[in-house]
Design a protein with these regions (language model features):
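Ligand-binding pockets and gating/stacking loops
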Residues: 1-125
Length: 125
């Protein structure tokens, strides 16, 4: 629904590829909520999309599906991805150890990523 953004993202990705920088650059385009189909005036907080490019990931695919029927696009119908899953995938794409823990004040261990996170394996090389 945003032709100018499509053109800008395509130009950025093409430029990074031509310069040999795409595999070393991770581009993520996202918002904090989904939009209703059609004119996009409503907010669907339970189903939103992200776009990933480069970073050595397996890109050019659609992972998951939103609902059809009465309220199309209002909910996740297949392959849900949680915020911890997203973060785990991002960290792995950047070469970080998602099992690492840091010590907070008071010697309280703080995990890099929530232990329930399941990386989006379909995207990882």
């Amino acid at each position: 629904r945003s032709p100018w953004m499509d053109a800008v993202m395509a130009t950025l990705i093409s430029d990074l590829k031509v310069r040999g920088m795409l595999d070393d650059t991770l581009v993520i385009w996202m918002g904090e909520f989904g939009r209703t189909p059609g004119d996009g005036n409503g907010h669907f907080s339970k189903a939103w999309s992200t776009m990933w490019a480069g970073g050595g990931l397996k890109t050019g695919q659609v992972i998951g599906k939103t609902s059809d029927g009465k309220n199309p696009g209002s909910a996740v119908a297949e392959r849900p991805v949680t915020s911890p899953d997203f973060l785990a995938t991002l960290c792995l794409a950047l070469g970080m150890d998602i099992h690492k823990e840091f010590m907070a004040p008071g010697n309280r261990p703080m995990p890099m990523v929530d232990k329930v996170a399941k990386p989006i394996t379909e995207m990882l090389g």
